[in-house]
Structure formats: structure tokens, C-alpha cells
Amino acid sequence: MESLNVDMLYIAVAIMIGLAAIGAAIGIGILGSKFLEGAARQPDLVPLLRTQFFVVMGLVDAIPMIAVGLGLYMLFAIS
């Protein structure tokens, strides 16, 4: 029975990390497309848009890193 619980933990961690990566990829893709759209409409605002783009991209990318950290903690500390 213990082996089944450990196997399910491995699957849960893999799903958590995978879904976090997929979500971040979709979010960064949408963010990049909106940045390019805004830069094409208002070329004089590119420096302001670029700063906001990188700040928000860092925030979007931080969530999967937290999920990876939690997943690895669950994988190595709990099992």
C-alpha cells in the first residue's frame, strides 16, 4: 500500500509541475502578443511598455517556480 501512495505522489507532482509550465507558457505567449500589439499601435510608448512587460512577465513566471519548489518539496521531503 505504501508503494501505491508514493506512486500517486510522483504522478501528482508531475501533473502539478506540468500544468504550471503549460499555464506559464500560455500566459507569457498572450502577454508577448499584447506587448507587440501595443508597440505596433504606439511606437513612442515602447520603453514604458517594455518595462511593464518584463515586470508582469516576471510575475507570471514566478508562479510556476513556486509550484516547482512545492512539487520538489513534496517529492523529496514527504516521500
From Swiss-Prot:
F-type ATPases have 2 components, F(1) - the catalytic core - and F(0) - the membrane proton channel. F(1) has five subunits: alpha(3), beta(3), gamma(1), delta(1), epsilon(1). F(0) has three main subunits: a(1), b(2) and c(10-14). The alpha and beta chains form an alternating ring which encloses part of the gamma chain. F(1) is attached to F(0) by a central stalk formed by the gamma and epsilon chains, while a peripheral stalk is formed by the delta and b chains. The keyword Cell membrane applies. SUPFAM superfamilies: F1F0 ATP synthase subunit C. The keyword Transferase does not apply. The chain crosses the membrane at residues 11-31, 53-73. Keywords: ATP synthesis, Cell membrane, CF(0), Hydrogen ion transport, Ion transport, Lipid-binding, Membrane, Transmembrane, Transmembrane helix, Transport. Belongs to the ATPase C chain family. GO terms for cellular component: plasma membrane; proton-transporting ATP synthase complex; proton-transporting two-sector ATPase complex, proton-transporting domain. F(1)F(0) ATP synthase produces ATP from ADP in the presence of a proton or sodium gradient. F-type ATPases consist of two structural domains, F(1) containing the extramembraneous catalytic core and F(0) containing the membrane proton channel, linked together by a central stalk and a peripheral stalk. During catalysis, ATP synthesis in the catalytic domain of F(1) is coupled via a rotary mechanism of the central stalk subunits to proton translocation. It is a multi-pass membrane protein. It comes from Buchnera aphidicola subsp. Schizaphis graminum (strain Sg). GO terms for molecular function: lipid binding; proton-transporting ATP synthase activity, rotational mechanism. This is ATP synthase subunit c. InterPro entries: ATP_synth_csu_bac/chlpt, ATP_synth_F0_csu, ATP_synth_F0_csu_DDCD_BS, ATP_synth_F0_csu_sf, ATPase_proteolipid_c-like_dom, F/V-ATP_Csub_sf.
